[in-house]
Amino acid sequence: MATVSMRDMLQAGVHFGHQTRYWNPKMKPFIFGARNKVHIINLEKTVPMFNEALVELNKIASRKGKILFVGTKRSAVEAVKEAAESCDQFYVNHRWLGGMLTNWKTVRQSIKRLKDLESQSQDGTFDKLTKKEALMRSRELGKLENSLGGIKDMGGLPDALFVIDAEHEHIAIKEANNLGIPVFAIVDTNSDPDGIDYIIPGNDDAIRAVKLYLTAAATAVREGRSQDLAVQAEEGLVEAE
């Protein structure tokens, strides 16, 4: 089972919070102190909380649950996509569109349009159009791919959200709360931990820290999924590789 040690976290700078003047007092229980006007996160709290979150992600994945990775800030964009793809899960790494979860019906229509445009771009339909029309459609395709490409095969609401930066992704968290979808989130010293089921106090800006969280989460999900496949193989539902 994937776990992350105190040493891993120190090396990735997980303990560096935000400047003290930007703090959210609700994060006080997770703060060790301050150094040079920057809050230091108490990793003795973070290590067990993160490892508990990994165990839970593993369980959800072993029950065939769908995990949606969310991170739209610059330091997370690439890492979120890589992590989700590495464990066959889903992601949103560009702007979170309001209603992405709470208005799933409408989102499903847009996904259908995205898939239609994808086939048109591959089956030669674009070549038969006027230059202007082809350009308009490929622009629409690009836009839809950017916002929905990571969830186009999700086939319904996710069973959990794994969020980088609770403050930045507060709309996604609120939608998940409204629908009773559990939220795992990296919560920095400037963020509000309310509404988060699995709080992971940590630096949400440093690329190394972001990669550490995502790699560990993806590994936990992969291991959970392989348990599920192993069980199915035992029951003769799938062929073991």
From Swiss-Prot:
Family the UniProt entry places it in: Belongs to the universal ribosomal protein uS2 family.
Gene3D superfamilies: Glucose-6-phosphate isomerase like protein, domain 1, Helix hairpin bin
Highest taxon listed in the record's lineage: Bacteria
Protein name (database record): Small ribosomal subunit protein uS2
Signal peptide (residue range): none
Gene Ontology molecular function terms on file: structural constituent of ribosome
SUPFAM superfamilies membership: Ribosomal protein S2
PROSITE patterns to which the protein is assigned, alphabetical: RIBOSOMAL_S2_1, RIBOSOMAL_S2_2
HAMAP family in the record: Ribosomal_uS2_B (MF_00291_B)
Any GO BP: translation
Keyword Ribonucleoprotein belongs to the record: yes
A cellular component term, taken from the record's GO annotations: cytosolic small ribosomal subunit
Source organism (scientific name): Proteus mirabilis (strain HI4320)
InterPro entries: Ribosomal_uS2 (IPR001865), Ribosomal_uS2_bac/mit/plastid (IPR005706), Ribosomal_uS2_CS (IPR018130), Ribosomal_uS2_flav_dom_sf (IPR023591)
